[in-house]
Every structure is written in structure tokens, then in C-alpha cells.
Amino acid sequence: MDSSLLQAIEEIEKFFQHLSERHTEQAETPDAPEPQNCMPLTAHAEESQHESTQSKTMPPLGSTMMTSACTNIPGTVLTQDLTMHPLKALEDLSETYSMGQKVTSFDQVKHTAGSQMTDVTVTPKSSPTDCQKTTITASNMTISNESSQLNTPSSDQTLNESQIPALLGDQMKTLSDNQTLCGDQVTFSSDQTLTDGHTVTSGSDETLSGGQMTTSLDLYGGQMMTSIDNQTLCGEQMTTSSGNQAFYGRQMTTSTGNQTLCGEQMTTSTGNQALYGGQMTTSASNQTLCGEQMTTSTSNQTLCGEQVMTSTGNQALCGGQMTTSTGNQNLYGGQMMTSTGNQTLYWGQMMTSTGNQNLCGEQVMTSTGNQALCGGQMTTSTGNQNLYGGQMMTSTGNQTLYWGQMMTSTGNQNLCGEQVMTSTGNQALCGGQMTTSTGNQNLCGEQVMTSTSNQTLCGEQTTTSTSNQTLCGEQVTTSTGNQALYGGQMMTSTGNQTLYWGQMMTSTGNQNLCGEQMTTSTGNQALYGGQMTTSTSNQTLCGEQMTTPTSNQTLCGEQVTTSTGNQALYGGQITTSTSNQTLCGEQMTTSTSNQTLCGEQVTTSTGNQALYGGQMMTSTGNQALYGGQMTTSASNQTLCGEQMTTSTSNQTLCEEQVMTSTGNQALCGEQMTTSTGNQALYGGQMTTSTSNQTLCGEQTTTSTSNQTLCGEQVTTSTGNQALYGGQMMTSTGNQTLYWGQMMTSTGNQNLCGEQMTTSTGNQALYGGQMTTSTSNQTLCGEQMTTPTSNQTLCGEQVTTSTGNQALYRGQITTSTSNQTLCGEQMTTSTSNQTLCGEQVTTSTGNQALYGGQMMTSTGNQNLYGGQNMTSTDNQALYGGQMATYSGNQTLYGDQMLTLQVGNMTTLTDDHSLYGGYMMSHQFSSLPYPGFLCFSSSHLIQGQLPKQKTQSCQFWKNPEVSRPYVCTYEDCKMSYSKACHLRTHMRKHTGEKPYVCDVEGCTWKFARSDELNRHKKRHTGERPYLCSICSKNFARSDHLKQHAKVHNIRPGL
């Protein structure tokens, strides 16, 4: 800068200092009014706001101490005790000062602490523009901008237009030199040029891009600084409470060291070995088991896939193999051994009771001999005549009835198919069975429990309130014991029992938390899912990485290290017990060497030969048998598929063939021979007991003659009347009962389908209904009554131990009151505060922390997501925010603070800048002078803002009431509960965990209520009945739509 211009500025400064000294000697300071809560104008020189003071005197101002609280701002920082008295016009001031010329550097003006300015009147002639003048009247001072020239007070030197630095477009001057700033740039101590919304560092000349911020280092994007040093945290990283280690993604550290656990990893109980996916370690050592592997009970041999060990040794059985009771012979598929020897029976075969004859397919033996019955054959009540298909037995004997069978009311014979029970006995009921009210008989299907005992309930079972019986399905636990809870289990408040699915940790122990686990405040337990680190280690966790127990080597993906070194294993790899050889997939090594076995391979007992698939070795040599092959007892002939050999030679029988009892004739398919000769019967044929007449298909003969009965016909006990289908006769007469019907014990009332009668009357119960033990109230579906009253429990409800309150689905009550906990809720150890989803309580109080929240080290303020605390107080910074150098002012995105010469602003005010605007948190809506909101467009145009107060908008944070926000791009959904967010995330991931369990149905759903609604299609359940026309519907919305036909509203 020209030395003459600097000299002129010094002369002006001396002039004002002289005026201040004169006024100090002559004037007294008036009493100062209360200071106003106003923020002085803080803008660049070219946007300074001038207010007309013509013909009026400004009110006196009290002493105002302006002290910068940040000692590291470069440049000359002013500390002044500025006292301003009422201004009056000075007639001697006749010179002008150009608005186009600005003093913009602290270094150019040497202020003197304690200086005062009095008796100065600024009188603008009009609203200032680029070419207008502002006249400042003072003695012996004239500054003119006529013809773009500048005259200094101390000389006649004239600065021409070419000598004045030109500011183009949106450029402005820095406060320390001639550097030009573009756009929203600002600088403090150097000549560095900042572009497009940059902020500046406090101690260096480093350039920051975009929404960067920093303390003393560079922070990019959403980075933030740790509270104890300058470590940079990216994205969702967090640091440990005792060090500067950065955590990535879902990482956490182990409780005993610096090992990093990634994804779903956990460590072993005896060391720091990392387990991947579904891995676990053996009970005797730290050997890692991959996939479905397990070890034997006597050694550490690894079993792959579906292998199990024999009871007498460590031989590995593959697939569906099992061993015989007398030796270690391997049985394949559906094979089993005979009771008298080691003969192998193939799929569907069984032995006769008198010998080792093999029965193939659906064959059974007659009661008088070893004749084989094929298909659905049975014998008559007077002999060994074979009955086929859906045949039934006469009512004069206890012979078994097939397909569609029912029992007479005079005996306890088994009823097949849709059997029901008589009311006079405790016989087992099949299909949709129910129990009587007088006994503890098992109930099948949709069983429910009687109120007088603790019998096991199947299906959607629930437990009684008087014992700790196991509950299946969506079980819940009683409040009086620590029984294991399945499905949506929760923990009782009296013990450290394991909680499954959606588990949370109790506050009294270090129990493992599954799913979206968090750690307890009293221990270093491993946390899964959205894990965080314990306070005892500093290791960095990246993605799915973890470290080895002996060093800080980083393992990526599904890697794990060997027990003897730091070799990295990928995927499902494992190392051998004797070396570091890597095994891939389902590989394992032999017990005698390091040979690698692939897939379902296993080695022979005599050597290291590898057997593939379902292969096994013969008992006499090392020949490999494939698939379902086996060898004959007399030689090493190989039998394929369902083949077997005859007892007298090595003839091979194919598929369903069997030998006759008198020779080696081969019978094919369902053939059998007659009892008098070797005639072959085809298909379902049989011969009568009196001759060799052949009966075809479903035919049979009556017991008194050779009359042929077709299909499913049977004769009555009093004559030869033919009964069709599933018909049977009653015990008191010839009334015909149709398929599924039965008689009551007190009369001839017909019961249809699965009906049964009550113990006190002839009321018919439908489907899965039953009656209560104290009255004839009908319970439908899965309902049951409480032991203390007749309150009806629906679905999976259970009652509390202290009252009759009904608990739904996965609910449980607290140990101190009857408060109901829903879903994954649990209570704290010190009070009944309810924790939802992934919440956990702080170590100093019962405040609930959501999702990825953590507590600050100095107080109970909650930090969300990528928030960090400022180094001086508990202010939370979001995303790209940074704090000002000396106070709680928050800068967002590309914001910056500006300083105006002559009207300096301290950096201790509690105000914030949003985007290109500036606002105050205090009195933001009041039109006080100095509380002006300037648009960034004013800076770009280089114009002064108009003299009016613009309304400022407060920063609104909708995430406060809905802290769980969807992280997918372009999705702005947020929820107040974590479980709601998890359900929503399934729309993005396509996850459908609720699968229909009906055979042949492949439907899957994201929500349980959708699955329950779908199941009604299979069951045919239509519980919603129209009160007008008696039509029923499976869904309530269908009933509402139907109600419009009658012009009524449902429920009215």
C-alpha cells in the first residue's frame, strides 16, 4: 500500500484522538440506561447500515466493553472501553468522505484503548449508493471523492482512479491487506483466497471446501473433531470414551483388549479369537467351527454339514446316515437294521415278526402268517382276507378301520382321519382333537389347556399362571420364575436369563444383548449390530473388520485368523489342527494327515481315500459305494438304487421287486403271490379265502358269502347291507351315519365333522371349541379361561400372576406392578420406566437413550447420529456445524461471520447464521436497530441493504420428536420408535421374515399382521359376520364394504 495513504490514515486517527481528549476534559458522563439486548451490525464495509441523525441527537450510551474472547484471531484485535456521548453538529466539519473508499484492515488502524469520540455529527444527504457522498464535518479535515480522487490530510498527493484498487462484481477487501475475496469468502490473517462458501481456520491459512469446518485441522463434509484432540471423525464415526480411536459402521471392541469386532462377530469366552457369522468354538479349546459344523463329544474332530458321530467311536456319518446297534456300519437314506441281525432294510422296507423277510413299499403281514399285503390291503374279521383302499370293519370287533374311519360308541377303538372323542372316556382324538373337561388328555392341533392342570399345550400354546410350564410359539414367561421365553422373548427383572430376538440387557449384569444390542454401563460386554466400543480400548474398527488377538492386523469381510498366527482366512475358511493350511467352504482334513476333503467327503477307516457325496466304504475293502449303493453279504457286488439280493443267491431285485416264498420268482411293483401257488397278483388284486377268485381294485367279499363289495363298501353286523363311503351303523339301530358323523352317548343326535358334546349336556361343539370347567361357556379357536374366573383369553393371551389382566402376544408384566410391557420393552432396575426398542439407560440416571445415542462426558445431554460436543460446553453440533471461537454461536453449511471496522462485534453473542442469513436467538422477531437479517444476494451485488428489518426464521428440528430417520436416499420418513423404523426399512431391503408355514405355500410378508390375515385363506376363517344377511367375511374392511349394500354402518 502507498505510504502516503498510510500517513493520511494516521493523521485522521490523531485528529479523532485529539477530539476525544478535549471532550474528556470538558464533559461529564451522564447516567447510562440499561444496555439493550441488541446485536450491532456485523457486515462488510460496503454493506454498512447508516442511519440519519440529521436534526436530532442520539441518546447517550453507557460504557460498553468490547473484548474478543478468542485470542487466536489473526490481525489486530481491539479491546476498548468506548464511551459515546450525545452527538452534536460541528460547524467546522466541511469535508467529505467517499463511500467507495473503505478502511478494511485492523493493521491499518492503530486504536488506542480508552479513546472517546464526541461532538461528531454524521449527516448523509440521501440514501447512500455507489456514487453518493457522505459528508463528515470536522475541523481541519477534508476528504473528497470528486473525480474518483483521494486527497490526504497531510499532503497534496492525489490518488487517481487507476491508483485505487478496483473491486469487481462480488469482490470485497480483506481486513489486513489488498487480497480480494470472492463470493462468501472471508479471511482473518493471510492472503489466502477462499471460494464458494468456505470457512476459515483459526490458526493456519488452509483452504476449506464446501461445508467444511475445523478446529485446528481440516474437516471435510460431515466430519467433526473429538473433544480431546484434533482427530477427524468421518460420517457416522464415534470415538471411544478413553481415547481417540475411530469406529466405523457397526464396529466395537472386545472387553479385554484392542481387538476389533465387525458386523455380527463376537469373541470366545476364553480368549480374543473372533468368530464370524454362525461360528462357535469347541468346549475344550478355541477351535473355530464354521457354518453347520460341530465337534464330537470325545475330541475336537470337526463334523461338516449334517454329520453326526457314532456312539462307539468318532466315525463321521454323512447326510442321513446312522449306525447299527451292534456296530459301526453306515446306513443311508431311510435304511434301518433288522432286530435279529445286521441286514440292511431300504426305504419303506420293514421286517416280519417271525423272520427276516423284507416287506417292500406299503406291504404289511397277515396275523396268521408271513403273507405280504400290498398297498392299502387289510384282512377281514373272520380270516386273513385282504381289504383294500378305504375299507372299513364290521361293528362286532375291534379291527382297525382305515381312511375315514370312525369308532362305535360302545368301545374305545381308535378313530382315524377326523376322529373325535366320545364323552365317556379319555381316548386320544386325532386331527382337530380336543380334550374332555374331566381329564388331562393331550389335545392335538390347535390344542388349549384345561384350567385344572399343567398339561402341555401344542401349537399356539400358552401357560397357566400357577406353574413354570414351557410355552411354545409366541411364548411369554410368568412373573414368578426364570423360565426360557421363545419367539419374542423378554427378560424377567429378577434374573439374568438370556433374552432371544430383540433382546436387551438387564442393568444388573453383563448378559449378551442380541439384535440391535448396546453395551451396559457397568461392563465391557460385546455388543452386536449397531455396536459401540467399550471404554477400555482404542482400536479402530473398519466396515466388517476385526483384528487378530495377537496383533493389530485388520481382517476384512468374513475373515478370521488362525490359532497359531496372523494368517487371514476368507469366507468359511478354517485351518487344520497341525498347520496353517487353509480349508475352503465345507472342507475338512483327515485325522491322519492334512488331506483336504471337499463338500460332503469323508475318509475311509483304513486310509485317506476321499469319499464323495453319499459314498461309503465296503466292510471288506476300500471300494467306494455311490448314492444309495450297498454290497451283498456274500461278495462285493454293488447294488444300485433300491436293489437288493435274494436270500438264496445273488440275483438282483430292482425297485419294488420281492421274491416269492417258494422260489426265486421276481414280483414286480405291487405284485404278490397267492397262498396256494405262485400266481402273480397285479396292482391291488387279491384272492378270496375260499378260492382263488381274483378281486380287482377296491373290491372285497363279505364275511358270509362271496358277494363282492365295490369301492369303500362294507357290510353291517346284522346283514349284508352295503354301506357306502365312510358310512357306519349305530349301536342301537340301523341308522346310517355319514362320513365324519358319530353318535352321542345319551341319544341318537348326529355329530358332524369335528363336533363333540359337552360333559353336562348334548350341546354340540364345533371345530376347536371346548367348554369351561365351571360352566357351559363355549371357547372358540385358541381361547382359554383364567383359573380364577371365567374371563376369556384370546389368541396368545395369558394372565398376570396378581390379577386377571390379559396380556397380548409378547407382553409381560413388571415385577413391582402390573404395568404391561409391549414388544421389546423392558423396565429399568431402579424404576418402572419403560425402555422401547433399542433404548438403554444411562449410568447416572434413568434417562432413555435412543438408537445410536450416547451421553456426553460432562452431563446427560444426548448426542444423535454424527453429533459431537464442543470443547468448551455441552452444545451439540450437527453434520457440518462448527462452533465459534469463543461462544455458543453455531455456523451451518457455508456460513461465516463478518466484522465491520468502527462497529466491531464480539464473538460471545448467542446468535447463529443460517445459509446466507444472520439471525439472533434472542428477540429475533423484534425490530430493534442492529437486528437486521442480510441476504447473501446483497454481498454478491455489492450494494447496501435497505433500511428495514427483515423477519428471521428460527431453525426448526423435526427430528426431535421423531429421532429414528430412514437413511435411504430420497426417503425422508422418520419415526418415534425403533420398531416402526425397522418395519419401514423392509420396504427398501425387501426383507420378508414372516413366512407362511402351510405346505406348498410360498407367500412371505414384511409384517406379522399381514401373515395372520393371509393365513385365513388357508383356514377358511371368516370371523366377520353381517348382522343383516348372515354373510361372513375374512376381513373387517370387506365387511364394511359389504355393509354399504344395506345402507348401514357396521356395528350399528
Swiss-Prot record:
Cellular compartment(s): Nucleus
Main location: nucleus
One GO BP annotation of this record: regulation of transcription by RNA polymerase II
Zinc finger (C2H2-type): 964-988, 994-1018, 1024-1046
Any single Gene Ontology cellular-component annotation: nucleus
SS bond partners: none
Cross-referenced SMART domains: ZnF_C2H2
A single MF term (Gene Ontology): RNA polymerase II cis-regulatory region sequence-specific DNA binding
Gene3D superfamilies: Classic Zinc Finger (3.30.160.60), Serralysin-like metalloprotease, C-terminal (2.150.10.10)
UniProt-recorded name of the protein: Kruppel-like factor 18
UniProt source species: Homo sapiens
Gene: KLF18
